[in-house]
C-alpha cells in the first residue's frame, strides 16, 4: 500500500530533486528555466528513458521498471514485439514522439520518474513491480481511487510546474487576472498568454490550467478533480 503523502509533502520532495537538477545544469532560481523531465530522469535519477511501441490503441502511454521483465505487445498490423526491460528503465509509447504530444510525453516521463522517486524514498510502501499507466488523468484500480497513482501524478506536476517557476512564467507573460476569471476564447488575451506559458514549460493546456487553479490564480474547481486531491 502506498504511503499517504499530502500535496505539501510531495511539493517538498519535488523541490529537492529540482534543486539537484538546477545545480547539475548550472541554473539559478533567480533566472528559473523549465524542467526537462527526460534530463531530470536520466541525469538526476539515473533512469534510462526509452521510446518504444507499447500498445496499438493508446491504452498504455508509459511504464516504469523495477525488476527485469519481459513485455509483449501486438501492433495494429499484427506484428508481435517482445522486449526485455531492465531495472531503472522508463519506457514511453513511441506514439508520443510527435511535437503535438509534447505535454503528454513530458507528463508521462515525469509520472514514471515519480514512481521511481517514491519507490526509492519509501521502499517498504511501494511494491517493486512494473507500473503501467494508461492516461494522464487519474487512474483508478478496481473502481477505487489509487493513492499511488494520485501521488505519482501530483509529484509529476510539482516537478514540471513548481510554484516558483509558474510565478516566474506569470510575470514573463504579464498574465493579469484580477478577478480570477479566464475565458477559453481567443478574445481573452490571457488565454493566449497561458497557452504560451504551457508551451514554454512543455506542459498541456489542461495541466497548466489545473496548476493555476490550485494556486488560486484562476477561480474555480480544478478540472479532473480527484476524490483524493489535497489542495
Question: Which residues are covered by each model-predicted region?
Answer:
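Active-site hotspot residues in diverse enzymes, especially metal/ion-binding acidic/histidine motifs
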Residues: 1-231
Amino acid at each position: 500500500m502506498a504511503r499517504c503523502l499530502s500535496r505539501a509533502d510531495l511539493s517538498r520532495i519535488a523541490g529537492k530533486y529540482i534543486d539537484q537538477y538546477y545545480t547539475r545544469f548550472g541554473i539559478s532560481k533567480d533566472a528559473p528555466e523549465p524542467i526537462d523531465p527526460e534530463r531530470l530522469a536520466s541525469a538526476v535519477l539515473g533512469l534510462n528513458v526509452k521510446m518504444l511501441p507499447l500498445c496499438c490503441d493508446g491504452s498504455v502511454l508509459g511504464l516504469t521498471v523495477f525488476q527485469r521483465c519481459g513485455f509483449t505487445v501486438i501492433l495494429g498490423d499484427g506484428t508481435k514485439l517482445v522486449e526485455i526491460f531492465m531495472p531503472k528503465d522508463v519506457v514511453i509509447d513511441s506514439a508520443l514522439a510527435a511535437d503535438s504530444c509534447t505535454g503528454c510525453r513530458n507528463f508521462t516521463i515525469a509520472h514514471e520518474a515519480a514512481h521511481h522517486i517514491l519507490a526509492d524514498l519509501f521502499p517498504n510502501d511501494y511494491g517493486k513491480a512494473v507500473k503501467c499507466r494508461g492516461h494522464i488523468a487519474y487512474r483508478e484500480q478496481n473502481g477505487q481511487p489509487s493513492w499511488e497513482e494520485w501521488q505519482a501524478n501530483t509529484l509529476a506536476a510539482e516537478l514540471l510546474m513548481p510554484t516558483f517557476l509558474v510565478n516566474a512564467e506569470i510575470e514573463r507573460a504579464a498574465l493579469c487576472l484580477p478577478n480570477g476569471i479566464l475565458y477559453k476564447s481567443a478574445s481573452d488575451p490571457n488565454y493566449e498568454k497561458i497557452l504560451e506559458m504551457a508551451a514554454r514549460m512543455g506542459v498541456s493546456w489542461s495541466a497548466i490550467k489545473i496548476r493555476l487553479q490550485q494556486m488560486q490564480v484562476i477561480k474555480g474547481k480544478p478540472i479532473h478533480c480527484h476524490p483524493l486531491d489535497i489542495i
